[in-house]
Design a protein with these regions (language model features):
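Acidic, low-complexity mobile loops and tails
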Residues: 1-55, 92-129
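Conserved hydrophobic positions within beta-strands
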Residues: 13, 59, 68, 73-76
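A short beta-strand motif that forms part of the nucleic acid-binding face
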Residues: 29, 63, 72
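Short, charged/polar surface micro-motifs in flexible loops or helix N-caps
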Residues: 32-33, 73-76, 81-83
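Short, Lys/Arg- and Gly-enriched loop/turn segments at beta-strand edges
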Residues: 58-69, 86-88
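Residue-level detector of flexible, active-site-proximal loop/helix-junction positions
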Residues: 63, 83, 106
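Short, charge-rich, low-complexity interaction segments located
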Residues: 79-93
Length: 129
């Protein structure tokens, strides 16, 4: 799997794409592959505050329910409501099926995240390849 180079990643398998002061957040292809068929996504509402490293929602698959962890702190400005009716979009293209958009509270948090190549190595080690 090629991970988009302009995204940043967490060891909990979320991605962040930054555009100015806005961060778009989703889960990685590695995460959706590990989860299997996604059947439900629980996300915060617009206006909610999220804190880096803390849960902001969950993803339910046929295998398990997994928490979503915020890669950065901020205020939710937009939620991908299409995932309410089509959560399987995450399985089809995890890097296009974003979950939430936030206004970044502390852009310096971005430096703590993994690059695409570092995340790819981390994910490969996790599965033992």
């Amino acid at each position: 799997m090629a991970y988009p180079a302009d995204f940043k990643y967490t060891k909990e398998h979320e991605w962040l794409k930054v555009d100015g002061n806005t961060g778009t957040i989703g889960i990685t292809d590695h995460a959706q592959n590990s989860l299997g068929d996604i059947v439900f996504v629980e996300l915060p509402k617009a206006g909610a505050e999220i804190i880096a490293g803390q849960t902001f929602g969950s993803v339910e698959s046929v295998k398990a329910v997994s928490d979503l962890y915020a890669p950065v702190s901020g205020t939710v400005t937009e939620v991908n409501d299409a995932l309410n009716t089509s959560p399987e979009d995450v399985n089809k293209d995890a890097h296009a099926a974003w979950m939430i958009k936030v206004t970044l509270k502390d852009p310096s948090e971005i430096a703590k995240l993994l690059s695409a190549s570092d995340y790819e190595k981390f994910a490969a080690e996790e599965v033992g390849h």
